[in-house]
Amino acid sequence: MAKLGKRLKKAVSTVDRDKFYALDEAVKTVRSNATAKFDETVEIAMNLGIDPRHADQMVRGMVQLPNGTGKTVRVAVFARAGKADEALAAGADIVGAEDLADKIQAGEFNFDRCIATPDMMGVVGRLGKILGPRGLMPNPKLGTVTPNVAEAVKAAKGGAVEFRAEKTGIVHAGVGKASFSEQALEENIRAFVSAINRAKPSGAKGTYIEKVSLSSTMGPGIKLDIPALVASLGG
């Protein structure tokens, strides 16, 4: 622990807590501070001016990161017959119907994302109390209830990131690994922030994006210059 404390202390000393960093400088600093013995995840935290307790102020969605997350995602698919074959061909790790539901009810959760064809929702619906709290319940708004299972599996495997605002109005997500190039991380971050911008709810009043910070798994947070970041998104 002393070793970890010394490393973190050194990393903190490289960050100006009163400064709002340009994206490129923030990414460079985060990468240089990611000195753990594993490939740290680069994480973004966005404080939004919303109250998610109100239905018209909820922020939730899915975004495809152009350079993936660097994480191996295990995908389970509820499908039958030809759709099950399509899911397997697309790279799904687990495919099933009632048999898959039985495994989940028995406590088997060896997957990170769950997809279902619409006709399977009668089976999946019964698992709501199990899958819901774990953030695994298929949802048509997120593209995880769909007849296009192959496309959904490829998206999940290729860097699709689900986001949802917490009760405090904060959205967290991993946007890549410290081993990614600076350009790859910047592209992923811009894609994520753009998705949050597009997901601005009708009930949001005043300043929408209040604070954005970037960090690695074991590193200190770095505040981003929001006006410059938003201006860099284009379109």
Curated annotation (Swiss-Prot):
GO terms for molecular function: rRNA binding; structural constituent of ribosome; tRNA binding. HAMAP family: Ribosomal_uL1_B. One of its GO terms (cellular component) is cytosolic large ribosomal subunit. Keywords: Repressor, Ribonucleoprotein, Ribosomal protein, RNA-binding, rRNA-binding, Translation regulation, tRNA-binding. Belongs to the universal ribosomal protein uL1 family. This is Large ribosomal subunit protein uL1. The keyword Transferase does not apply. SUPFAM superfamilies: Ribosomal protein L1. Binds directly to 23S rRNA. The L1 stalk is quite mobile in the ribosome, and is involved in E site tRNA release. It comes from Rhodospirillum centenum (strain ATCC 51521 / SW). InterPro entries: Ribosom_uL1_bac-type, Ribosomal_uL1, Ribosomal_uL1-like, Ribosomal_uL1/biogenesis, Ribosomal_uL1_3-a/b-sand, Ribosomal_uL1_CS. Signal peptide: none annotated. The gene is rplA. GO terms for biological process: regulation of translation; translation. NCBIfam families: rplA_bact. Part of the 50S ribosomal subunit.
